[in-house]
Amino acid sequence: MPNYYLADDTKYTRPSTSAMSNLTELCGLKGLADSMARFDPVTGEKNKLRKSYKNQLLDLTGKFDIPSQPSLVRIIRDPVLAETGGKSLSVFDRDLLSRGLDFDATPSTGIPGFNPAMLGMPGPGKPGIGPQVGGNRLLSVRRSYNTESARESSNNEETPMARRKRKGDDDTDGERRRKRK
């Protein structure tokens, strides 16, 4: 059996404070809260937080002054960035940038060297992959064939059902499978 040791005989009581308690009064901050209240409880007028109130806040922990503009100094002084320094940065060639960031209109002949068929996009005058919408079904993709060779090859292909009918084996309802069992 393991030995248990009692470290202290002190009995602890539950604190009497709860989330429903007025913590401002319990901590002795009611006077400070009243002096800095947004509305005056007697007149109901708005009190502006003046610069003179900042002196009363100096003793409290935390930041009370909001910076006017976001600062990048914290990001620049980041120790992770300090290790890499400027090693990962390099200077771009201006000619390369001007060629890569050309915002001229696309010529009417299309982009030289770009094959829209590689992306399944319709070429000039040819349908490609497009959306097929029907009823409550989800958007599906279908391939439309526009060439005569594709139509001929699809008409010449015989389905397994057509092959069976041509051979006289008209077992469409699974009679052969039932006989085997």
Swiss-Prot record:
GO terms for molecular function: transcription coregulator activity. GO terms for biological process: regulation of transcription by RNA polymerase II. Keywords: Activator, Nucleus, Transcription, Transcription regulation. GO terms for cellular component: core mediator complex; mediator complex. The keyword Phosphoprotein does not apply. The keyword Kinase does not apply. Residues 143-158 have a biased composition (Polar residues). Pfam families: Rox3 (PF08633). InterPro entries: Mediator_Med19_fun. Component of the Mediator complex, a coactivator involved in the regulated transcription of nearly all RNA polymerase II-dependent genes. Mediator functions as a bridge to convey information from gene-specific regulatory proteins to the basal RNA polymerase II transcription machinery. Mediator is recruited to promoters by direct interactions with regulatory proteins and serves as a scaffold for the assembly of a functional preinitiation complex with RNA polymerase II and the general transcription factors. PANTHER family: MEDIATOR OF RNA POLYMERASE II TRANSCRIPTION SUBUNIT 19. Component of the Mediator complex. This is Mediator of RNA polymerase II transcription subunit 19. It comes from Yarrowia lipolytica (strain CLIB 122 / E 150) (Yeast).
